[in-house]
Amino acid sequence: MFKIYETELAGRKLTIETGKFAMQANGSVVVRYGETTVMTNVTAAKEAQDDIDFFPLSVDYEEKLYSVGKIPGSYNRREGKPADSAVLISRAIDRPIRPLFPSDFRNNVVIVNTVLSDDQENSPEVCAQIGTSAALAISDIPWGGPSAAVAVGYVDDKIIINPNCEQRAKSRMKATVAGTKEKITMIEAGADNISNEIMLEAIKAAHVEIKKMCEFIQTMRDEIGKPKFEYKSFSVNPEYFERVCNELTEEMTNAVKETDKITRNENVDKVSEKIKNIAIEMFGENAEEEHKFDIATAIHDLQKKCVRSIILNEHIRPDGRAIDEVRKLTAEVDLIPRVHGSALFSRGQTQVLTIATLGTKADAQSLDGIDFDTEVKRYMHQYNFPSYSVGEAKPSRGAGRREIGHGALAEKALVPMLPSEEEFPYTIRLVSEVLESNGSTSQASICGSTLALMAAGVPIKEPVAGISTGLITDLEDSSKYIVITDIQDIEDFFGDMDFKVGGTGTGITAIQVDIKNDGLTYEIIKEAFEKTQEARKMIINDVILKAIPETRKEVSKYAPKIIAMTINPEKIKDVIGSGGKVINKIIDETGVKIDIDDDGKVAIYCDDIENAKKAQKIIESIVKEYEVGEICEGTVSRIAKFGAFVDLGGNNEGLVHISKISNKRIEKVEDVLAVGDTVKVRISEIDDQGKISLSMKEFETITDTEKEEKED
């Protein structure tokens, strides 16, 4: 049955339709916000997957170019693989809804969000977040929502919910906040050094609207929601797990209490063998095959129980650290020859090598998406996580969603601190290679980025560091919890959150929050902000600035040299010339690359600074605007009966009429001048069309013979 539900979000009408599209999906809705329209379809497999130990959820966000009246530029005119921006939105939709599925649910679930139209004012991402929650809520798929999400901006010292296009352009914050009626379930943000206090107020303001949307979706659920289907529960055999806990809890606790990751894994493997042996004793010699799930789950759950117990009850970490203690940190720069900047940042057994490369404007990345204007990125950060970083032997398959997400987080952390294009007219690419991983590699990439940029001579405004906090909550009483600083892999894996924050010592530039429980309270978020800020201050002052106290004064000798200048936009055509004749001649003569913007900004690139200066001089002569009375030097370029044409340089030419060549009467120009002569001239007139008239009379030299004739 076709139904339309209407509400208001941030002062604008939002509608959710269901019962018309995709009727065979488990749940289907169309969300309209202004003229932005997103269709969300959710489907679930009827049978569970027996051979996996995780919940198989897939979330896609599809940006269709027809939504903004564009035709794809590919050969076959089809949309290609999702852009990085679409991947990031898919991840942002996934993270708040995943913890709300039953923990023992193993049916494959696929969620597809399709942008049907985008009015460039109302966020399709917000529509997709709301559509996902609504479609799941009214479907028969087991899920503990509803949840909702809104975008948040900060313009003119005011928090704006779901900012429009104009507000987004001026905003010092670009954040997406998701939550349930009770708690916050996801934060994704980039910000211009925003304080903890303002960020927390923004989250609270977002939650007000989130609560309203959750109530709205719950109304839909109550009216038209399908009964949730029954599913095969995947949970460990209780008698088996009870025996495992009774016999091996102390041994597993000792196994995970280890500083070295490799040794810890070896210890856990030994205990795991004993867990398998208990299964064989209880279920027979085929237990490893027939009770594979029970064994794997028992190993996982016992580790989780022990790690959480150590932190909650002993107030120490599995590796012996205090609750707020950061692992040993080291930083080095200039490790790799010939590259433009390099840095190695290590935090315990997490190690990241970051390389900076400086390029020309032509190296900037064009992002052709559903925005009307093609975005051009002059700063890029890419993150690679090879299997050898965790001691595994797996082939590389290129960047996946996780790599794209971590790279984007480290990228947005540094963007507010970059110099303007006018101040530093380079394209900048950073690549972070994870060499060793024991948690928080994305935050190590942020620190490595700061070091590599400073080593490359990029004049960043302030150093930026990144740190993660984790959460361990008492499963019996959620009001009892501990927020821990600088989480390693097992604390992330068995804990309740990974709260990543990048920023300076005073403010926040990036946030990414993943949770595994039912959400975070304001108190937990506030504590996470405070602890990450203290850790960032320490990392910046005690590690980063000791490795490189200030940004290099000059770029690497291997980096291209750039001269930036600004010309009158009306003169651009003169620099380029007919069919590019003039600019190509400059390039051929000097070996430089030249970029010219429509507003007259010119960038000259060359490995040899002297050649760049030569090209600059030529361009300056081309765009030079002469004034009447100005004295110049030029070369006679051609001769006519009525005068001589003088090349003033830079494709500028003036005429010396025969009457202005000499104070004496001359019959032929050739009697006085020849092509190639260097002459001094004065600008006598410039007409409305820019034609220049010259005079040489003022500079005529009187010869000795003329002096004698004059004296006689």
Annotated model-derived regions:
Residues R95-S103, I138, L335, T360-D363, ...:
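Conserved helix-loop functional segments at active or binding sites
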Residues M1-K232:
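Long, basic N-terminal domains or extensions that often function
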Residues D140-T259, L453-K553:
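Mobile "lid/hinge" segments at catalytic clefts and subdomain interfaces of large enzymes
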Residues M1-A45, D53, K232-T374, P560-D574, ...:
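Extended amphipathic alpha-helical scaffolds
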Residues S103-V109, G144-P146, M213-Y231, I262-T263, ...:
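Flexible, glycine/charged-enriched surface loops at secondary-structure junctions
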Residues G27-V29, N122-I141, V333-A356, N438-V458, ...:
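Conserved phosphate/anionic-ligand binding catalytic regions in large, soluble enzymes, centered on
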Residues A25-V109, V115-S117, N122, E188, ...:
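Glycine-rich, flexible beta-strand/loop modules in the N-terminal catalytic cores of phosphate-handling
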Residues Y558-A564, P569-D712:
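Single-stranded RNA-binding regions, centering on S1/OB-family and related RNA-binding modules
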